[in-house]
Amino acid sequence: MVMFSQDHVQIVYGSTRICKSLAPANKRKTHRTIVVAPRRGFLRIPPDGQDVNHVKIVPTTSSSLAPPRDDERRPTPPLRPPLTVYPYGTSLIRRSARDAKLRSKLIVFHITRPALGQHPQNPGISGPAAMDHSEFLTSFRREVDRQTVLTAESAPATAEVCLGDALPGGVMGGGGLPAGVGSASAAVAAAAAAVAGVPVAANPVMPATATVTTPPMIDLTSHHRPLTLFTPASAAAAPAVATNGGNATYILPADCRYAPLFASKYKYVFEEVSRLMRLHDSTAVQLQISASCGNAFQALKSALLKLHNVTVLAGQQLITQTMPHTPQAVATFKFFHQDPNRVLDCIRPVVPRSTSYHETGVYQMWVSGATKKDLFDAVTLCASIVEKQPDVFNINVSLLTYPSIAAPHLPLYNEFTSFRLPTS
């Protein structure tokens, strides 16, 4: 299913779906094209992660389109540009520098009729339709950017953070917040101060210099400031409060108590990762994912590469020539390895004699995180994707004998390790 607006495009036909292919990469058919026909002179192709590789745009015909509305009953010029194939996921506005050269080609497609400027065959037409092509593109991009900003600003905020640096220790103000959130924040601050043993003023006033920051975050470099995470007033359960004697107070959000559905399905994976990270450092724990489908593996890899502070090593599994061991070799190996003190006695030079190797059709990926939280986020993302195709993926957790961490992750690792959770 492809999500397109019915006002702008009509799906003509699409090729069959590509799924679970174990063929070699050079013989696997991955090219899936969907053919669309625009309706109003331009076509928006939103990136929505569908299983489509290319989009083919064809000229509109009377048979492929529904009857036009009254405002669209105009004579269409006999312009039929050639068929063009564009990569699926190309949107009207691309912010990447590598697509700057293609922007003029991928924004507006004049297929149904010339919607801009003068008519190529009737130069006498003028008026609002005689707008310059570049001027129209500029105004169109500006309008799309403005709608994007308005959509981002109108999204409801799930939580707010109030930093009260100018207030005495333990006093939290509720000024600058909405009426509902202000009353809830005052009650939460009073509960936190009561637990910390700090007196609370009767009517705390927020100074003019106080700021409200969204989204909530804890500054690991200076976490001794009083910081409160406010939850919606409709939260059923009271938030958990942690304090270390009044120096810092952290109130956990109430929605962190409810795990998604896939957490119960892969409970053993989360529990094993948590157990290993309690016993060992995060640099010694690594996540291993195997997949039997190349397309699903690439989708998981693309999703993981959008996470922060992770390292990913991915590739296809190779198998060498299979050769059984002789009974004498098996007996010798087991005899020397029964006693740990005789392990070095059985070491002999190894001569590689395999004459062939080939791909097994299994794809493997190793994921490491800069901190324990980053590794746990990677496990959570993998579980949410693996849940959709459980017969394709396999998750494994490995413990390394020697710590492994990328050099750019060392500052973040040191800050995360030096942070101490306040004791209640």
UniProtKB/Swiss-Prot annotation:
The keyword Lipid biosynthesis does not apply. GO terms for cellular component: host cell nucleus. Signal peptide: none annotated. Residues 57-82 are annotated as: Disordered. Coiled coil: none annotated. GO terms for biological process: regulation of DNA-templated transcription. The keyword Heme does not apply. InterPro entries: Herpes_IE2_3. It comes from the Viruses. Keywords: Host nucleus. Plays a role in the inhibition of host DNA replication in the infected cell. Targets the mini-chromosome maintenance (MCM) complex and blocks the accumulation of MCM proteins and their loading onto host chromatin. Belongs to the herpesviridae U84 family. This is Protein UL117. The gene is UL117.
